């Protein structure tokens, strides 16, 4: 059985956890099982806690990883909540791949791709909010803010929003294909990506509360007070990467006094561990050549002492 999704930064993930000895490993975003399968093969004493809010992906991976079923517990739950639901005392590794899988992007009825006949974009099909509702019911001001914040489209956000408002006043926008035609194929100056792709990114982030979920995951990881545990997070756009980078920096700080303070008053001793990736780890040219979607991937690693 073959996975329909190519896991990004696979070798880099294996390298990050090459010193894993034994204990529990949490894959916060199991998806179609590519990373987890490689880790299970590499580490015979690894016990996998696998979770995903996409039930379709979870059911696929149960079959895909059947060979290792006695070492896996499967959980249909979003990654932001998993740390509150599992024992953490034996947790030695955590991986979170905060991206949309190839299958989700390519599957017509999920409504992620520009040519889809649907306008959905929900990673969890139980969620009530879809891209169709956002596009057709959000106010002009709300849509404009989403495009500015999540699509980095400030120079053209007002113009793009007006196009959508004008179109939906004539008839409901019901497909991704229709929306991409409304937006058009133009590109921002100096950016090698279409406006439509950036609009779709912004809508997907809004529909799935992606930044909020990532922040909640990081908060729950911090509250878990992990010891001797390595965390690797793969993100796909600058907003996510910035959140991870800044959180890791804060976790590493020994002194938490205001930077303007003349001398330390906190007593130090607040560091949770160490950043193991001073710079974000990116895909190699070789990987990008056979998996173009890996070109945006960035991985950062933190070790909890």
UniProtKB/Swiss-Prot annotation:
GO MF, one annotated term: rRNA (cytosine-N4-)-methyltransferase activity
Localisation per UniProt entry: Cytoplasm
UniProt-listed InterPro entries: RsmH, SAM-dep_MeTrfase_MraW_recog, SAM-dependent_MTases_sf
One Gene Ontology biological process: rRNA base methylation
GO cellular-component term (any): cytoplasm
Name of the top EC class for this enzyme: transferase
Thylakoid as UniProt keyword: no
Name of the gene: rsmH
Keywords in alphabetical order: Cytoplasm, Methyltransferase, rRNA processing, S-adenosyl-L-methionine, Transferase
Protein name: Ribosomal RNA small subunit methyltransferase H
Protein origin, superkingdom: Bacteria
Family under the similarity heading: Belongs to the methyltransferase superfamily. RsmH family.
Species per Swiss-Prot/TrEMBL record: Campylobacter lari (strain RM2100 / D67 / ATCC BAA-1060)
NCBIfam families: 16S rRNA (cytosine(1402)-N(4))-methyltransferase RsmH
Pfam families: Methyltransf_5
Reaction equations catalysed: cytidine(1402) in 16S rRNA + S-adenosyl-L-methionine = N(4)-methylcytidine(1402) in 16S rRNA + S-adenosyl-L-homocysteine + H(+)
Positions with a binding annotation for S-adenosyl-L-methionine: 33-35, 52, 97, 104
Task of the protein: Specifically methylates the N4 position of cytidine in position 1402 (C1402) of 16S rRNA.
E.C. number(s) listed in UniProt: 2.1.1.199
């Amino acid at each position: 059985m073959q996975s329909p999704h190519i896991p990004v930064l696979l070798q880099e993930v294996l390298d990050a956890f090459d010193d894993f000895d034994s204990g529990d490993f949490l894959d916060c975003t199991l998806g179609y099982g590519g990373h987890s399968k490689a880790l299970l093969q590499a580490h015979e004493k690894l016990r996998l806690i696998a979770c995903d809010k996409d039930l379709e992906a979870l059911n696929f991976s149960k079959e895909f990883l059947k060979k290792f079923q006695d070492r896996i517990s499967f959980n249909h739950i979003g990654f932001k909540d998993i740390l509150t639901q599992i024992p953490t005392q034996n947790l030695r590794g955590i991986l979170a791949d905060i991206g949309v899988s190839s299958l989700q992007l390519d599957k017509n009825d999920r409504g992620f791709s520009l040519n889809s006949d649907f306008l959905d974009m929900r990673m969890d099909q139980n969620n009530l909010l879809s891209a169709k509702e956002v596009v057709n019911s959000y106010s002009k001001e709300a849509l404009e803010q989403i495009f500015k914040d999540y699509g980095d489209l400030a120079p053209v956000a007002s113009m793009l929003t007006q196009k959508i408002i004008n179109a939906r006043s004539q008839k409901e926008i019901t497909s991704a294909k229709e929306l991409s035609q409304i937006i058009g194929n133009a590109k921002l100056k100096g950016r090698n990506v279409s406006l439509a792709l950036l609009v779709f990114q912004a809508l997907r982030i809004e529909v799935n509360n992606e930044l909020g979920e990532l922040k909640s995951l990081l908060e729950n990881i911090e509250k878990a007070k992990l010891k001797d545990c390595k965390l690797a997070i793969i993100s796909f756009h600058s907003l996510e990467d910035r959140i991870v980078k800044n959180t890791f920096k804060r976790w590493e700080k020994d002194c938490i006094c205001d930077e303007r303070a003349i001398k330390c008053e906190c007593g130090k001793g607040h560091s949770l561990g160490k950043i193991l990736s001073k710079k974000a780890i990116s895909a190699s040219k070789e990987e990008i050549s056979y998996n173009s979607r890996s070109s945006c991937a960035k991985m950062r690693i933190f070790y909890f002492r």
